[in-house]
Amino acid sequence: MKKKVVVAFSGGLDTSYTVMYLAREKGYEVYAACADTGGFSAEQLKANEENAYKLGATGYVTLDVTAEYYEKSLKYMIYGNVLRNGTYPISVSSERIFQGIAIARYAKEIGADAIAHGSTGAGNDQVRFDMTFLVMCPEMEIITLTRDGNLSRRQEVDYLNANGFKADFAKLKYSYNVGIWGTSICGGEILDSRQGLPESAYLKQCCKTGSEILSIGFSHGEINSVNGKVYDDKVEAIRAVETIGASYGIGRDMHVGDTIIGIKGRVGFEAAAPMLIMAAHKFLEKFTLSKWQQYWKDQVANWYGMFLHESQYLEPVMRDIEAMLESSQRNVNGTVTLELRPYGFSTVGVDSPDDLVKNKLGEYGEGAKGWTSEDAKGFIKVSSTALRAYYLNHKDELPDD
């Protein structure tokens, strides 16, 4: 009986090689499974299916996990305004976990003996896929031909060409990972720390001049409207923001960080929707959360992003952090306006029923209604007690006159 193997199939070079090699050289019954987190068009998915069969797959399936990805991860990333190193919206990092979970589920459903993926031995994805598979289907063998054989792109292209599968893999200067939460760009100038990416490297080009106002509405921290149009489907709301923002070339940057395996890595990205949505959300929170809600939410959100990146999504503490993040959003309601311009944007204003700037006690820099001048002087004097006590004993440490 043939060994049944599920390949996490993106249609790229490494996974194409994996499908063909396992089917042709090993004689395995290969099932190509493409886990879509919102980055594939209908045409791309159709091409993936056709290519999988050309490569020798016994079966092919597209696993659409975009809605699950939003409900179980993106929602909390927005609650926490999660940006790794203050820059990167953790696009690929978070996607891979849910792709791995979907692949593992499918492998169990069809009774597979093994799971294969195309990760190399130098990046984060090998950790994310392997850890997910080890937890969800520990009885299955994990096959990684590119990693185990330390294969070069040239070797894989030559093998595919020699066996009748013609593609332009070798001509690609950059490799892209496209998803609902942004596009990552690797290769080319990325490999030289002294260089940035040229305009031509970005998939979405700035095609607008001037400026325009964008409004984003939130209900309990979740996006629910774009320019006045209400969305029940949050993924579609994200797509709407992406379309508008990308037309201005917004959301481009370069992320430099530490990989899970310990080396430094650099990646370019374009992520208009994440940058605009989280900027609007964070701005709204400044008006609607207390000082300490903001402070502690930022602390746990930083850990949430770190754990996502480090392939620890299945760690039980993540459910506890999600509960805290969700609780913090009960009063994060309202509409934020932003002004967009080529390659940038700025926040403009907030309209919220929970706006704490609007209160009956006092208006910053104008006047106090909730206390008297004597109250203010007493508050300041008591607040200075610890400092005054210290410097009474350490007058030599006071600033020079």
Question: Which sequence ranges carry the predicted segments?
Answer:
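Nucleotide-activated chemistry modules centered on ATP-dependent adenylation/adenylyltransferase
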Residues: K2-D401
